[in-house]
Amino acid sequence: SISAFLVEADYSLMTGSILIASSVIFCASIYPLRVREFVLLGQIPAIFGIIRSYEILADTKGYGTEPLILLLLTLGLAHWWSLQKNRFITESEPDREQANGISFVFEILYSGAIISQVLIWLIATHQYSADWLWIGSVTTVAITAYSAMTRAKFIGSFSQIFLALACVCQINICIYNNEGTAIMAMIPIATMLGTSLIIPYITKLSGTVSESMSRTFGLIQRGYRLASTGLLMLWIYRFVPGDSQFWVSVVLSFACVIAGKWRPAAEWGWASLAFSLSGLIYLCAGGSNPIPIPDQWITFVCILIGIVFFFSSLLVSNKETLTSFFTYVCAGYILIARELLERDALLPSLAAILLLLTVQQISRR
């Protein structure tokens, strides 16, 4: 009857807040009344309020107290089901496994609701454009840090949608040459890399972290590193001059080798391999903006870079980054074989072969 009365009233954001506040009151009633049915059925007003709030938020321009109250009430319900479920089990004395499942479902529901409300509100306030490069990045960082400190893993997981939208915006800029500068297009990449490095420190500050929470943040870190690799390759293609694309790819590949020593992870090896392959494409494909390397020296450059990768991997004790060494050396082998078969081998080809023999002798000793 409360839900029917409120839904039929003149609807506004404040009416939605009253609906959700009704559910908050029913949740609090478990402590003095200990009636489990009030808590469960009392979520109906909040569900109505959340559904109806989407339409109102989509037409809301700017910031104000009414959207803030609505968001805070939804956030409060998400935290209640996440943090107070043990009290809910103790007071109601139901089946423990069943109560955990109920708390789990409502925590996911309200976590998704708060993220979707913020998303609709931001899109209504800021139309989807190049501005979302920084809006999505900043929002994701703020919510991820908050979820790590409050251990609200579902809120942190769902908040990645903001960064995903920023990444989609960057992809459109890089592929279709839409509006946007090189610095703005770098914001989502820097956000992902920075967040992947900061997450371990945030979890340490928050104290003991559950295994599921640690696994969730581990997946986020791994996804960030791999996604940032692909976005960096697009950024190089779009904003770096053609005669520098190869060298930038090589430098980033070496940076992945160093990062693998500083913070060991298998994905650094894959990132190094990806930049190596893109560098080879820029080196061998040429195009309208060829790199300033004579064609006869390309084979020698491939072998030389591969050897540098080999010794760098040994110095940092990172076996995963040996894939970049094999990539450049194999490319050098193929180029040498082609030059010999076509009888086009010159002095640089001989220098590359002698360089390989020299490294082989050094390695034996």
Regions found by a protein language model. Give the residues of each.
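Alpha-helical transmembrane segments of multi-pass membrane proteins
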Residues: S1-R365
